[in-house]
Amino acid sequence: MTALDAAYADRYARARSWRGQGGTVVGYVGADVPVELVTAAGALPVRLSGRPGRPLGHALEYLGAGVDAATLSLFAGLLDEAPPLDLLLVSHDSEASLQLFYALREIRRLGLEPHLPPVWLVDVLHLPHRSTAAYNLVRLRELRRRLERFVGAAIDDDALAAAAAAHDEVRAARRALAVLRGPGHRALTGVEALTLVGAGSALPVDEYLPLLRGALGELAGREPRPGVPLLLTGSAHDEPGVYRSLEDDGWLVVGEDHDWGDGAGEPPPAPPTLDGLAEWYQSRTVTEPPAAAVARTGAHHVLSYVRTHDDAPLWDFRAVAAAVPVPAVLLAAQEYGAVDVAAVRGDGPR
C-alpha cells in the first residue's frame, strides 16, 4: 500500500523514469481511452488529473470559466508543469474533454505552447447499436495504426491479447477491492480506495497488478473502518479532497459510480481482440442500478455530488432518489475539491 500511495501522490514519478530509460509515455484524458492498445505498443499510459488550488493561468484564458474546474485544472497542469509526455490522447467522454481537445489542437496549430505533446482524439461512442460498434472498431483500428507509426513498432495480435488480459486482471482485482469496502469488511476508507485505484493509472500494468494484489492481502485482515456508510454518485473525483472531508465528518465512502472508482459496475472482461475491445468500450459503464449499488455496498445514505459546470448528474437525481431504499441527498454547485459537509449531514453523523 505504501508503494501505491507514493505512485498516487506523484503520478509522474514512474513516467519520468520510464522516459529516462528510453520508453514512450502516453498521457490520456478520460476513461474511454483503450489503454490496452497503449500497453500493447510498449508505451506507458498515464491518466492526467487536476489538482484543486492549482493556478489556472492561461488555461482559463484559453477555455474560459464555463468549463468544469477539474478539466481546467488538468489543462493548467499541462500548460504550466510540462509533464513528461510524448503523446496525449483525449477521449470524447464529456463535453469538457472535447472542448479541451479542440483547445489543445488549436494551440498546437498556432504554435502558442511549443512544449505541448501531439494530441489525438479518441472518439468512442456508447449508443447500443451495431452501427456504433462498427464505428468504434474503425476508430480503434485507426488508433492502432497511428500508435504503431508513433512508436515505430507493430502491435501484433499476441501483444494485444496479453495487454487485454493484463488489464482485465487489474479490473478483477479492483472488483475484489470493492468487496473489501462492503458489508462484513469495511476494510478501507474511501480515500484509501481512491488512492489504490488511482495509482493504477500512473504505473505499468505489470508493476501495478502485484502491488494491488499485495494491498488486497494487507487489507483482508483489517478491522472495519469507522463511519456511516455512504454511496457517492454524480461528478467524478480525480483527487481525494471531497472523500477526505466527508470521512473527517464521520462518513465512510463505501462505493461510487464514477470512473476514478473501483469499477464495481463495469461489464465482464473484454475478448482479447480489437473487435472485443471495441465492443467492451462501447458497453463500458461504471454505473449500477442505484438500488443494486446500495444493496452491494450496504450504504445507509446516497449522496449525489455535483460540481459547478458539471450539470449532467442533476438530471439523474430524481430517478436515483426514487429507486433507493435509503435517504438520498443532492448537493449541487460544489467547487472542485470541496464539499459542503453541513448540507450533507441531515440525519447522518454529527
List each model region and its residues.
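Acidic/His-rich segments in extracytoplasmic proteins that coordinate ligands and/or metal ions
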Residues: 73-149
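A short, acidic, amphipathic alpha-helical segment used as a generic capping/interface helix at domain edges
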Residues: 77-78, 283-298, 315-316
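Peripheral docking tails and interdomain loops at the edges
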Residues: 317-350
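Short, acidic/turn-prone active-site loops that include or flank metal/cofactor-
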Residues: 49-55, 60, 124-125, 257-262, ...
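Redox- and metal-dependent alpha/beta enzyme cores, enriched for Fe-S-associated oxidoreductases
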Residues: 30-50, 227, 233-293
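Proline-aspartate-enriched helix->loop->beta-strand connector
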Residues: 85, 294, 298-304
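An N-terminal, globular interaction/scaffold subdomain
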Residues: 25-97, 101
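A charged, amphipathic alpha-helical module
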Residues: 2-24, 137, 141, 145-265
